[in-house]
Amino acid sequence: IGAEATAVWIGNSPLIAACAARTGLPTLNLTRELSPVLFEYNRAGAWNGHIPVTAINSAILVVAAVLYGYDGIAFSNERSASSATLEYDGQAVNHQWSKGYAFERLLHTWVHAHVAADLAYFSLLRPFSELAVTQRFARLTRYFEVFSSCNRNFRLLGPRPADRWCGQCPKCHFVFLALAPFLPKITLVGIFGRNLLDDESQLPGFDALLEYREHKPFECVGEGGESRAALHALAQRPA
């Protein structure tokens, strides 16, 4: 990125730790502790909607930056994160709003006004679409055997997949589809352990990504147009 940087992550995920180690940068691992009362509420049937993890992590990193003397916080949120998941009653609803540009500017402005006027908060990937990101990531082969974007690997409670990719969730579907135009088939299948597009039972999941008869999943995935573009590009390649 043209400047000194530290790879920072929050929590105890060995997958994230392995990716951070592959960067070759100095690392900093932060931890947080959730109140056990939260899980008691869940068991009692409390409403449990989406947790804006990026907003929470951003606040933690602001505190860490002040304590440890950093002058900037760089996320990797792409342009597509600002797009609505759907429109409801005339209002845009975005599952990943705290990854979008509107939140980024709000927090940046608030931090400057109330915390530190010289602390930058931004995303390096903001100008790029998801496909522009995956096209570049496809060249970074050192991460292929350690990275995962499967949400089931990052559950706080409950079972996790035996492998890095469950192959069933919208995140697995989207990352597979977004990487497919830019990687040889044998490499892509090697990352995921199987060809997700060969499994007819997965078709409804891919249809949702394409926004075919359904809205985009409530997950941090790319725009429907990007998924359609990826599938079109893949269709032009020999089998």
Question: Whereabouts are the PLM-identified features?
Answer:
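Nucleotide-activated chemistry modules centered on ATP-dependent adenylation/adenylyltransferase
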Residues: 1-239
